[in-house]
Amino acid sequence: MTLRLADMTELLADKVQAELLGNSELLIERLSTLEAAGPNDLAFLSHPKYLGQLAQSAAGCVIVAPSAREAALKRGPCIVVDDPYYYFALVTQLWKRQHFPGAAPAIHASACIDPAAIISPHVSIGAFACIAAGAVIGEGARIAEHCVIGANAIVGANSRLSARVTVADDCRIGERCIIHPGAVIGADGFGFAPHDGQWVKIEQLGAVRIGNDVEIGANTCIDRGALQDTVIEDGVKLDNLVQIAHNVRVGRHSAMAGCAGVAGSATIGAHCTVGGGAIVLGHLRLADGVHVSAASIVTRSLLKPGHYTGLFPIDDNAAWEKNAATLKQLHALRERLKQTEKSLLQLQGSLEEKP
């Protein structure tokens, strides 16, 4: 299937004003990178450091910023917008709607739906999905194969749950959310009281509340709160294999990369990012606009916006072992340095006293 350049810009005109230069009748067959694109492909240039690739690219059309307009025109058709990366994201959404339209709403005969569940119009429910009593499925929602929606849980309008997603009892999913395969929303938080050498379970009586336009990656787990709810605010994006513990609150439009973990009762502000494999310890607070580098361990609250890194740099193993050994002695070296400074000051003082 193809899409005419003029049609593409027209369909997106209500969201972004773009200037189409060159052959507007060009038929786009594929979206691609600058390096791999062919004469009927659309690519994008989002960063000036890749400007050198532009002249070498065989792309039929390239989305560029105004600063790259002249360079792009020298090689052929281009779309000029203020934010090429954002525009390309909109193009991918348009492309998916045009080329991969969803199936018509239907409820599979093998789905198990409690009579007390509320199923809105235009809902799709896949094979062997289970919808418990009191659950509410909003209009236009899609529940894929083998999903489990617990008692009194809510799935908002036009949300999409992929195969094997679990939404436990009393948990709420907002509108237009996307939840990828295997995610578990509302499992018990990790709460136990030590008593006589044993661990006594603390029942997790809260739930999970997820806002609108949230995307949750495959096999990500968001635990229900112990007493209050775990909260994921509007627009949050979680990658695969992210762990959100009980009573955590994640502020609007924050994002976390794969294998990040947030321990219980931590608060992540709005517009934060947490890199892959990073860990935020429990009961800490990250202010709005905090960005944590991959593999960092956050051991204290970060109350000012900014970029934070907390990891030991990679090196060849021999050098790393030497640096690690030195790090173990850092406190002793600090004390020696203080004593040396003290001795030097005393020596300086004695020299100044001499006639």
UniProtKB/Swiss-Prot annotation:
S-S pairs: none
CDD domains: LbH_LpxD (cd03352)
Role according to the record: Catalyzes the N-acylation of UDP-3-O-acylglucosamine using 3-hydroxyacyl-ACP as the acyl donor. Is involved in the biosynthesis of lipid A, a phosphorylated glycolipid that anchors the lipopolysaccharide to the outer membrane of the cell.
Active site as annotated: 246
Gene Ontology terms, MF aspect: N-acyltransferase activity
Protein name from the UniProt record: UDP-3-O-acylglucosamine N-acyltransferase
Family of the protein in this entry: Belongs to the transferase hexapeptide repeat family. LpxD subfamily.
Enzyme Commission code: 2.3.1.191
Highest rank taxon of the organism: Bacteria
HAMAP family to which the protein is assigned, alphabetical: LpxD
Catalytic activity: a UDP-3-O-[(3R)-3-hydroxyacyl]-alpha-D-glucosamine + a (3R)-hydroxyacyl-[ACP] = a UDP-2-N,3-O-bis[(3R)-3-hydroxyacyl]-alpha-D-glucosamine + holo-[ACP] + H(+)
Pfam families: Hexapep, LpxD
EC primary class: transferase
Biological or metabolic pathway of the protein: Bacterial outer membrane biogenesis; LPS lipid A biosynthesis
PROSITE patterns: HEXAPEP_TRANSFERASES (PS00101)
Gene Ontology biological-process entries: lipid A biosynthetic process
InterPro entries: Hexapep, Hexapep_transf_CS, LpxD, Trimer_LpxA-like_sf, UDP_GlcNAc_AcTrfase_non-rep
Keywords: Acyltransferase, Lipid A biosynthesis, Lipid biosynthesis, Lipid metabolism, Repeat, Transferase
GO cellular component, one term: membrane
Organism: Polaromonas naphthalenivorans (strain CJ2)
